[in-house]
Design a protein with these regions (language model features):
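Catalytic cores of nuclease domains that cleave nucleic-acid phosphodiester backbones
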Residues: 1-57
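Metal-dependent nuclease catalytic regions and adjoining charged, substrate-binding loops involved
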Residues: 61-69, 74-156
Length: 156
């Protein structure tokens, strides 16, 4: 945060090659070094009391549920950045902590594939003027991998 080459909230603009849609990003923090360029996004969270051994799972869940990996990939692509970090700051009174989390290349690729799909969907909706609802049929809610691991751990 105190690096002498740190820049804050620089705006970048580009156009998606496939759809022609304009893309705009503004990383909270970026540092361009001779050998790599990195950026970080500061996120305040309210996770309550989290046991240390479960914090990584909770932060990963936060990243996925809020689609932070999509914006991370978009930031890296549009601003030509090599690495992405989140700086999570817990805002619960009396329980302050900070966690710095690097986005793996696999997580960035997942975000990239998901934001590319989303851009295609937006482009199709713009072209057809058909904006589909997020849920179009009833479904059965099932446990995800995170909850299955919790169930397995509690069943032992």
């Amino acid at each position: 945060l105190n690096h002498p080459d740190r820049k804050s909230e620089i705006s970048y603009f580009g156009f998606d090659e496939e759809t022609g849609l304009e893309i705009r990003v503004r990383p909270d923090i970026e540092i361009r070094l001779p050998y790599e360029s990195i950026c970080a996004d500061v996120k305040s969270v309210s996770l309550g009391y989290v046991r240390q051994e479960r914090l990584k799972d909770r932060l990963h869940r936060e990243i996925i549920e809020r689609d932070y990996h999509l914006s991370a990939a978009m930031y890296c692509d549009v601003a030509n950045l090599d690495k992405f970090f989140w700086i999570f700051v817990n805002k619960d009174a009396g329980y302050h902590w900070v966690a710095v989390v690097e986005a793996s290349q696999e997580l960035l690729e997942l975000g990239r594939q998901e934001y590319r799909r989303t851009l295609r969907q937006i482009n199709e909706a713009l072209e057809t003027n058909n904006w589909p609802a997020p849920i179009t049929e009833s479904y059965t809610d099932e446990l995800n991998d995170f909850d299955l691991r919790r169930l397995e751990a509690l069943s032992i």
